[in-house]
């Protein structure tokens, strides 16, 4: 079972006491890479400090919500049956979280919709313990020429999740996440 650092602000959060952190560092989990970073948009896109969590069963959004609130980021949970394309266009999120193997709109479909919207949008894909799903995430990233996909077996440790969110905020020019 994962341990929370002593004297951290997460120490008393019951949710985190039941989360086992992924032992592989996030940097090593970066899927694919080496793409040219091209996007259908000219110049960097200004995004909102908003994360879309595509999930049908509330599995990872409660833990992410705690961190997002602490960082001043809005988290919106959307079901996998909702049309994601208009939502991406209207709300301009700084990142999308999804599960690769969900019952409705699986992670591969979410990645396809993200690629049609903005190939540079950071996507955190949870693959579970099935190694073939990691391979599927790598293949989809390569085929769709996505540049911001990070695949994890389960929700990353707190520090890595904060790092992912700050990186997404910088890329999306979310000024509320930038230091003073």
Which stretches of residues belong to each language-model region?
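Acidic, metal-coordinating helix/loop segments flanking the phosphotransfer/catalytic sites
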Residues: 77-95
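His-Asp phosphorelay/catalytic-motif detector in bacterial-type signaling
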Residues: 92, 117-124, 147-148
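As written
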Residues: 107, 138-150
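CheY-like receiver
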Residues: 87-90, 113, 164
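Alpha-helical interaction/dimerization surfaces of two-component signaling modules
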Residues: 66-70, 87, 140
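Non-catalytic signal-transmission and effector/linker regions of two-component phosphorelay proteins
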Residues: 1-61, 65-66, 156-180
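Conserved active-site segment of CheY-like receiver
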Residues: 56, 126-130, 154
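Conserved phosphotransfer microenvironments
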Residues: 97-120, 127-136
């Amino acid at each position: 079972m994962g341990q929370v650092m002593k004297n951290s602000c997460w120490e008393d959060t019951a949710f985190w006491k039941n989360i086992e952190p992924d032992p592989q560092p996030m940097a090593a989990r970066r899927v694919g890479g080496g793409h040219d970073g091209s996007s259908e948009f000219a110049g960097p896109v200004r995004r909102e400090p908003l994360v879309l969590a595509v999930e049908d069963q509330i599995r990872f959004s409660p833990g992410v919500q705690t961190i997002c609130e602490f960082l001043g980021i809005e988290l919106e949970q959307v079901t996998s049956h909702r049309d994601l394309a208009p939502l991406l266009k209207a709300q301009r999120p700084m990142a999308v979280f999804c599960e690769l193997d969900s019952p409705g709109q699986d992670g591969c479909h979410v990645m396809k919709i993200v690629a049609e919207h903005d190939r540079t949008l950071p996507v955190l894909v949870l693959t579970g313990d099935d190694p073939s799903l990691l391979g599927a995430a790598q293949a989809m990233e390569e085929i769709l020429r996505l540049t911001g996909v990070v695949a994890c077996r389960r929700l990353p440790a707190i520090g890595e999740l904060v790092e992912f969110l700050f990186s997404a905020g910088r890329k999306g020019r979310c000024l509320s996440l930038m230091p003073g």
